[in-house]
């Protein structure tokens, strides 16, 4: 059965095209700096928002029109697989991602849940044999079911800890079987509402124990994918332990886990933490911890995770600027952890949304590449910090200066003169590059 019968393979038609079902900027085979766009961007479709999301919110029931929703139970799960690979093929995306409960319904017992998962994984495995689309990452949902009300690895109930471990064990086995590039840990319930009833030390210790067990089991079964932590400060939990990259990095270092993990950074989670997307990418990058990206955007006027498709070209450009300086994402990718708006309820809206996101990151890639090629910001930064390449600044950097020497130097100083940060000039340059690249004539790559 065709679930999108009126939509064919999405072509690249260039920036002058007015076809809503065509890419204007994303040309998978176009080379940018020696690699194709497809190799740079490594796009991925999120199974949960795209195939299980129904548009419901706290004020209204689901309203999405989805042809596969005429089914229920395991028949619905199978229909979603069919619809998924049809969409993957028509968008020509190289990757997808899922939580365990996205692909198969939970049973009355853990054994029944395993049975359901095995049946759907069999089906996915068959589709993957003839599809270019591979598994970027999978994960276990450890936050939706009432059993996880107090957390999973940080639950006050050891039975819940054990159940969560069983789900992750199964998830790692699925990851190995389907050839996942990564495995993600997102602690939506790993945190607390109040310290009045919380043993924070025990919870953090247990979270570390849980992650060490996961590392050990991955080695035991021969799964060599990259482990990823996805930081988020809040929602659904008031205070989550993986608040942001800096917080999660400190946790990994404290518990001897840093060498086993990198970060999966989501734009909207950065917004909730009070950071820009590029800030979180930069912190991860300079510590060698940038692993993958959940590509979306938030609404700064709203205080929750809106998971909008990314269309802000400043953000996609500055994100790709960090990713290119990182040497790419390695085994990671750009996963669209994004959902169409409640008012965009027709099946074709799924295509319009992904086209918008893919085009936006294609522009960001080309602008970032040209900025780096022309060393626009690098030249300015080098000049700004020039005082640390000579004289007393060089001694500071090389570790040969101490407080006594610095005091002696400072006592001899006259007036200290600073130079302008030129922020407005730099923003003008960024605008100029964006306009040049996004215009039809801006095709240099």
From Swiss-Prot:
Positions annotated to bind Mg(2+) 1: 230, 266, 294, 337
Residues where Mg(2+) 2 binds: 266, 269, 305, 307
Protein localization: Cytoplasm
EC class (word): isomerase
Entry keywords, A to Z: Carbohydrate metabolism, Cytoplasm, Isomerase, Magnesium, Metal-binding, Xylose metabolism
Catalytic residues, chain numbering: 99, 102
EC number, as in UniProt: 5.3.1.5
GO terms (BP aspect): D-xylose metabolic process
Cofactor field: Mg(2+)
Gene Ontology MF term list: magnesium ion binding; xylose isomerase activity
Binding note for cofactor: Binds 2 magnesium ions per subunit.
Membership in a protein family: Belongs to the xylose isomerase family.
PANTHER family linked to this entry: PTHR48408, XYLOSE ISOMERASE
Name of the molecule in the record: Xylose isomerase
Gene it is expressed from: xylA
């Amino acid at each position: 059965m065709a679930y999108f019968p009126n939509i064919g393979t999405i072509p690249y038609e260039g920036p002058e095209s007015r076809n809503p079902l065509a890419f204007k900027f994303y040309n998978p085979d176009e080379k940018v700096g020696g690699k194709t766009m497809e190799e740079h961007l490594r796009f991925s479709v999120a199974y949960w928002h795209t195939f299980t999301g129904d548009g419901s919110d706290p004020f209204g029931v689901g309203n999405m029109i989805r042809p596969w929703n005429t089914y229920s139970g395991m028949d619905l799960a199978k229909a979603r697989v069919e619809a998924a690979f049809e969409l993957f093929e028509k968008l020509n995306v190289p990757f997808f991602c899922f939580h365990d409960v996205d692909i198969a319904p939970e049973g009355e017992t853990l054994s029944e849940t395993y049975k359901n998962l095995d049946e759907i994984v069999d089906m996915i495995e068959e589709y993957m044999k003839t599809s270019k689309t591979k598994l970027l990452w999978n994960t276990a949902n450890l936050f939706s079911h009432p059993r996880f009300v107090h957390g999973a690895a940080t639950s006050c109930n050891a039975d819940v800890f054990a159940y969560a471990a069983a789900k992750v064990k199964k998830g790692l086995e699925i990851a190995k079987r389907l050839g996942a590039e990564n495995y993600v840990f997102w602690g939506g319930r790993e945190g607390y509402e109040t310290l009045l009833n919380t043993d924070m030390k025990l919870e953090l210790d247990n979270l570390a124990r849980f992650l060490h067990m996961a590392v050990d089991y991955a080695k035991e079964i021969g799964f060599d994918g990259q482990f990823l932590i996805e930081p988020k400060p809040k929602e659904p939990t008031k205070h989550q332990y993986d608040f942001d990259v800096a917080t999660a990095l400190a946790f990994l270092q404290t518990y001897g886990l840093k060498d086993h993990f990198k970060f999966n950074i989501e734009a909207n989670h950065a917004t909730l933490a009070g950071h820009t997307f590029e800030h979180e990418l930069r912190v991860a990058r300079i510590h060698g911890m940038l692993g993958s990206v959940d590509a979306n955007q938030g609404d700064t006027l709203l205080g929750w995770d809106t998971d909008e498709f990314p269309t802000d070209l400043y953000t996609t450009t500055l994100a790709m600027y960090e990713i290119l300086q990182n040497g790419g994402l390695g085994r990671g990718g750009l996963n669209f952890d994004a959902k169409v708006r409640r008012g965009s309820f027709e099946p074709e809206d799924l295509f319009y949304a992904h086209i918008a996101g893919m085009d936006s990151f294609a522009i960001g890639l080309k602008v970032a590449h040209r900025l780096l090629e022309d060393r626009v910001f690098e030249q300015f930064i080098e000049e700004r910090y020039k005082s640390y390449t000579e004289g007393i600044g060089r001694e500071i950097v090389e570790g040969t200066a101490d407080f006594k020497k610095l005091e002696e130097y400072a006592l001899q100083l006259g007036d200290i003169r600073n130079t302008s940060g030129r922020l407005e000039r730099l923003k003008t340059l960024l605008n100029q590059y964006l306009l040049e690249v996004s215009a039809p004539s801006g095709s240099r790559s």
